[in-house]
């Protein structure tokens, strides 16, 4: 009865297998949730999946559920630890066995160490969640920056191409203006040479007219015989002078026209020079703008390279975090196996306690049986001593009585005495023990001394 009660108590304290199956299902669920989180983190790191608000909300809900499960498991562990402490106190109060206490202390220390490891794992899990949120925000920032840089890169080449086209057009116009300027310079030089030649001819004709004018009065003073020749010469000179004057007028007109054209060409040349200067300034400013634009592009490329390096570093950190999460999963699995081993050890300890209680009960029962048998033997020995004393007294009285009887009866008395001696001789202790009776103190049922075990069973049944 007592052994059954202890078994039931141990079963009620330690629980049964459904709780273990429930904890296993919760652990499997946690493993599935962690695997799903790993896949989502892999999708984020690979850049294939972009987190929407709905998915982020769903992940936050899953994280909250996991935290609730973690708190629930922690509460269950604390309750089990309290139960273990209470059972240990009960065992310490009931039994003074040092080995069991040492084993229980070792198991409690192991449980405390595992609780510390679980706390550390939960803290690392929180850190991983924070790093994951920071990494997702950083990836979102990097994606927005890369999109803006791509847009700027698509806009910048168009502007650069248009500016390059404008520069090429301006260079072509400048080359045309320089060629025209060179042609105008050559033409101007040729016109100056031509004008100088005309002026020299005009100067020579003027000299000839002057010499002809000085020679006319001298020729009139000559004799009239030479008059006809002189008139002919005068006509020739007049014709030459008129033609020279006409040529001079024509040349003067051409000179004025050429000077006007020269002034026009100079004005155009100055305008072209101004245009060339303006184009040079515009080209210089355009080149400076292009250099600035190229410098900005270089800075942008450096920034893009830096962002790519930061992205690579973030991916490396994510890989490290993935490895750490895998290590944590392996540690969780190891802890799960160790918890299973601990539960097996606890069941073994419970079985050992049960066996020890059964052994102690059997020992107590045997001790009580032995004490009762010793008491019965002591009583039987006392009764045996009393019987022996009574027999000796009766024998002495009988001998005195037989001495008073007549002599003829001596022989018959001797025979009867021998018979009585044989009959009254002390029996062996085993025979006396077999003939002695033991009775129940409650219902007064008698049992032989050899059947003392049956008497004990009867007493236990009768005392109920």
Swiss-Prot record:
Disulfide bonds: none
GO terms classed as biological process: cranial skeletal system development; establishment of protein localization; midbody abscission; mitotic cytokinesis; regulation of phosphatidylinositol 3-kinase/protein kinase B signal transduction
GO MF annotation list: identical protein binding
Effect of residue 187 to A: Abolishes interaction with PDCD6IP
Subcellular location: Cytoplasm; Cytoplasm, Cytoskeleton, Microtubule organizing center, Centrosome, Centriole; Cytoplasm, Cytoskeleton, Microtubule organizing center, Centrosome; Cleavage furrow
Residue span of region Required for localization to the interphase centrosome and to the midbody during cytokinesis: 355-464
InterPro entries cross-referenced by the UniProt entry: CEP55, EABR
Coiled coil: 22-186, 238-337, 374-403
GO cellular component, one term: intercellular bridge
Subunit note: Homodimer. Interacts (phosphorylated on Ser-425 and Ser-428) with PLK1; the interaction is indirect via the MTMR3:MTMR4 heterooligomer, occurs during early mitosis, regulates the phosphorylation of CEP55 by PLK1 and its recruitment to the midbody where it can mediate cell abscission. Interacts with AKAP9/CG-NAP; the interaction occurs in interphase and is lost upon mitotic entry. Interacts with PCNT/Kendrin; the interaction occurs in interphase and is lost upon mitotic entry.
Protein role: Plays a role in mitotic exit and cytokinesis. Recruits PDCD6IP and TSG101 to midbody during cytokinesis. Required for successful completion of cytokinesis. Not required for microtubule nucleation. Plays a role in the development of the brain and kidney.
Protein name: Centrosomal protein of 55 kDa
Organism of this sequence: Homo sapiens (Human)
Name of the gene encoding the protein in the UniProt record: CEP55
